[in-house]
């Protein structure tokens, strides 16, 4: 203390700065916390899902796994790393159209997926059964997973094998619901032809509602009577009847 009394103010400030601890404890702790708590995507695909040790075995997965577990689980509705260049409706498929019945292979619709399952996970999971034409998760315009995916095999037998193996098997804690896409979708796309029994209502394509029978009154026709409407019109008399009435009237006037 006595030494500082003999020192100038600038020397005391320099001495105090040199005696301060280097680095910020709060910032360092935050960096250590962030490094230890957050895991990479490799642990999620390799060990977390397959039930093995994280980081061992690379991206291969032995079987559909139960859970990634821990704090490495991504938050729901996480945006994927890569979005498709051109968005299209999830139920739209360019294969439906002229010659859709000639489409070969087998197509599976996988639903009840965890929101963290990506396209790479689906491809990796089903590629062991055969060659894939397409395997993709459905996303909305915001990049959030819809929990469904399309898996298209080149051979229908491979699709049936995969459906038999994985249908109902939990993936990340949620059992997968796998269905084989058939021609029922085409039947749903066909226009419904209404059959009228005794003049029922028919709906022509691009037209308005009408009735099959021409004797039936249109909608709202003659339903409500306006002012003075609905009364029987006055009967018109012929010339002979008018002359007879005039003669009778003149006869009554003469007698009176």
Swiss-Prot record:
This is THO complex subunit 4-A. The keyword Nucleus applies. Residues 1-14 have a biased composition (Basic and acidic residues). InterPro entries: ALYREF_mRNA_export, FoP_C, Nucleotide-bd_a/b_plait_sf, RBD_domain_sf, RRM_dom. Keywords: Chaperone, Cytoplasm, mRNA processing, mRNA splicing, mRNA transport, Nucleus, RNA-binding, Transport. One of its GO terms (molecular function) is C5-methylcytidine-containing RNA reader activity. Residues 1-86, 186-256 are annotated as: Disordered. PROSITE patterns: RRM (PS50102). GO terms for biological process: mRNA export from nucleus; mRNA processing; RNA export from nucleus; RNA splicing. It comes from the Eukaryota. Residues 106-183 form the RRM domain. It holds the Pfam family FoP_duplication. Component of the transcription/export (TREX) complex; TREX seems to have a dynamic structure involving ATP-dependent remodeling. GO terms for cellular component: cytoplasm; nuclear speck; nucleus. The lineage of its organism: Eukaryota, Metazoa, Chordata, Craniata, Vertebrata. PANTHER family: RNA AND EXPORT FACTOR BINDING PROTEIN, THO COMPLEX SUBUNIT 4. Residues 216-228 have a biased composition (Basic residues). Functions as an mRNA export adapter; component of the transcription/export (TREX) complex which is thought to couple mRNA transcription, processing and nuclear export, and specifically associates with spliced mRNA and not with unspliced pre-mRNA. TREX is recruited to spliced mRNAs by a transcription-independent mechanism, binds to mRNA upstream of the exon-junction complex (EJC) and is recruited in a splicing- and cap-dependent manner to a region near the 5' end of the mRNA where it functions in mRNA export to the cytoplasm via the TAP/NXF1 pathway. Belongs to the ALYREF family. It comes from Xenopus laevis (African clawed frog). Its main location: nucleus. Signal peptide: none annotated.
């Amino acid at each position: 203390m006595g030494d500082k009394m003999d020192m100038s103010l600038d020397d005391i400030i320099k001495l105090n700065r040199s005696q301060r601890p280097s680095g910020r404890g709060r910032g360092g702790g935050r960096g250590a916390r962030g490094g230890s708590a957050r895991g990479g995507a490799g642990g999620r695909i390799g060990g977390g899902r397959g039930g093995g040790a994280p980081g061992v075995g690379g991206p291969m997965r032995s079987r559909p796994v139960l859970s990634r577990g821990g704090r490495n689980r991504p938050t729901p509705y996480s945006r994927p790393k890569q979005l498709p260049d051109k968005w299209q409706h999830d139920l739209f498929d360019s294969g439906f159209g002229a010659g859709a019945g000639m489409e070969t292979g087998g197509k599976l619709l996988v639903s009840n997926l965890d929101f963290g399952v990506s396209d790479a996970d689906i491809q990796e999971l089903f590629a062991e059964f055969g060659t894939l034409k397409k395997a993709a998760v459905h996303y909305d315009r915001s990049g959030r997973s819809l929990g469904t995916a399309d898996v298209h095999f080149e051979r229908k037998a491979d699709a049936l094998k995969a459906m038999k193996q994985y249908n109902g098997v939990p993936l990340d804690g949620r059992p997968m619901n796998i269905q084989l896409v058939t021609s029922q979708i085409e039947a749903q796309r066909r226009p419904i032809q209404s059959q009228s029994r005794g003049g029922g209502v028919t709906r022509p394509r691009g037209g308005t509602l009408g009735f099959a029978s021409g004797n039936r009154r249109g909608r709202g026709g003659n339903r409500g009577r306006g002012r003075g409407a609905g009364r029987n019109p006055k009967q018109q008399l012929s010339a002979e009847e008018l002359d007879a009435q005039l003669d009778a009237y003149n006869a009554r006037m003469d007698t009176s």
